[in-house]
């Protein structure tokens, strides 16, 4: 399993958002129990496994930053047709069984009505709240995409510079504060494998006790993993920003955020104000969930999230 909440795979190319026809309560007339069904499925999985939040956060991020939030990441590859899942950095994305279960239940109650893209959005939102994060509304009405091509996946690694990150987020209208909220918010839960932060283990600026701990943890076989948030690894809170200030960031991008003059004050604001962080993270998630969405007659409503209808 690769890094559970690898939001550090910052994107290179993003498409403009399409906001038309998305609205709160989109399914009130066609499938009233849609959001409650998804919420119940998510809770049942989260109650057994608290890493569900990290898994769904990563899933939504990796889906939305590649040609928009259209559930293209959910398509299974075949021998004749590879998909976004075929790309190495998507190999560790998990939680698909949660989406499958919700979709199966929804098809029994409201056939061909609720999109897989909306299920991912609702499920991620609910998992964040379960992990102590902000509760927020999301607009629905997304359609599922008709394309899932490995060549569309343009992802950078965890050593990306702040300047590169700012440029990428700016291309879709995200400001610096929103970027910091998304990166830190994604890293407040989940793990990173040792191969992804070898540069940090060698960094003398890292907290010496943590560096010694990481060296010991990474001696094991099969690329061991460690929590990115060493103090509250299953809670969506502002603790990750406190650790950045204390030179305890696991990933290079997180350490860069506190060292770069354009983001340092934002990290500090979030570190000492959990309410501010939660509000900013909720707003960032709402905005990210509307990147490049398909609405109206575009795309389709899949009956199986892992395969196109035709």
Swiss-Prot record:
Q: Signal peptide position in this chain?
A: 1-20
PROSITE patterns in the record: PEROXIDASE_2, PEROXIDASE_4
* Amino-acid positions noted as binding Ca(2+) 1 in the UniProt annotation, renumbered to this chain: 63, 66, 68, 70, 72
Stored Gene3D superfamilies = 1.10.520.10, Peroxidase, domain 2
Where in the sequence is the active site? 62
| Membrane-crossing residue ranges in chain numbering | none
Q: What is its EC number?
A: 1.11.1.7
Q: Which CDD domains match?
A: secretory_peroxidase
Q: Which cysteine residues pair off into disulfide bonds? A: 31-110, 64-69, 116-305, 194-218
Task: Enumerate the cofactors the protein uses.
Answer: heme b; Ca(2+)
Instruction: Give the binding site residues for heme b.
Output: 187
Q: How is the cofactor bound?
A: Binds 1 heme b (iron(II)-protoporphyrin IX) group per subunit. Binds 2 calcium ions per subunit.
InterPro entries membership: Haem_peroxidase (IPR002016), Haem_peroxidase_sf (IPR010255), Peroxidase_pln (IPR000823), Peroxidases_AS (IPR019794), Secretory_peroxidase (IPR033905)
Reactions catalysed, as given in the entry? 2 a phenolic donor + H2O2 = 2 a phenolic radical donor + 2 H2O
Residues bound to Ca(2+) 2 are 188, 229, 232, 237
State where the protein is found. Answer: Secreted
Keywords from UniProt, A to Z, are:
Calcium, Disulfide bond, Glycoprotein, Heme, Hydrogen peroxide, Iron, Metal-binding, Oxidoreductase, Peroxidase, Secreted, Signal
Residues the record annotates as the site (Transition state stabilizer) are: 58
**Listed GO MF terms:** heme binding; lactoperoxidase activity; metal ion binding
What further fact does the record state? There are 73 peroxidase genes in A.thaliana.
What the protein does comes down to: Removal of H(2)O(2), oxidation of toxic reductants, biosynthesis and degradation of lignin, suberization, auxin catabolism, response to environmental stresses such as wounding, pathogen attack and oxidative stress. These functions might be dependent on each isozyme/isoform in each plant tissue.
Regarding protein family, the annotation reads: Belongs to the peroxidase family. Classical plant (class III) peroxidase subfamily.
Query: What name does the UniProt record give this protein?
Result: Peroxidase 8
Write the lineage as a comma-separated list: Eukaryota, Viridiplantae, Streptophyta, Embryophyta, Tracheophyta
């Amino acid at each position: 399993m690769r890094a559970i909440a690898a939001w550090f795979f910052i994107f290179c190319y993003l498409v403009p958002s399409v906001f038309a026809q998305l609205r709160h309560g989109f399914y009130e007339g066609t499938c009233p129990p849609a959001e409650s069904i998804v919420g119940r499925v998510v809770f049942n999985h989260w109650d057994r496994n608290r890493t569900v939040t990290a898994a769904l956060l990563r899933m939504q991020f990796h889906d939305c930053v590649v040609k928009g939030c259209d559930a293209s990441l959910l398509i299974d590859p075949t021998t004749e047709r590879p998909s976004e899942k075929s790309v190495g950095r998507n190999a560790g994305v998990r939680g698909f069984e949660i989406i499958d279960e919700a979709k199966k239940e929804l098809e029994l109650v409201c056939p061909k009505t609720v999109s897989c893209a909306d299920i991912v959005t609702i499920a991620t939102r609910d998992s964040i709240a379960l992990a102590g994060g902000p509760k927020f509304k999301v607009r629905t009405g997304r359609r599922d995409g008709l394309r899932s091509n490995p060549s569309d996946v343009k992802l950078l690694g965890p050593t990306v510079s702040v300047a590169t990150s700012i440029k990428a987020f700016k291309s879709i209208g995200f400001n610096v504060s929103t970027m910091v909220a998304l990166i830190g918010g994604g890293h407040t839960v989940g793990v990173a494998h040792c191969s992804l932060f070898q540069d940090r283990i060698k960094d003398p600026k890292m907290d010496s006790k943590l560096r010694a701990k990481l060296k010991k943890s990474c001696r094991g076989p099969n690329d061991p993993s460690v929590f990115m948030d060493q103090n509250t690894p299953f809670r969506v809170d502002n603790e990750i920003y406190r650790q950045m200030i204390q030179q305890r960031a696991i990933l290079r991008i997180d350490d860069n955020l506190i060292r770069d003059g354009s983001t340092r004050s934002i990290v500090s604001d979030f570190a000492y104000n959990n309410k501010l962080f939660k509000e900013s993270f909720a707003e960032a998630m709402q905005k990210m969930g509307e990147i490049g969405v398909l609405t109206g007659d575009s795309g389709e409503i899949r009956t199986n999230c892992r395969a196109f209808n035709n």
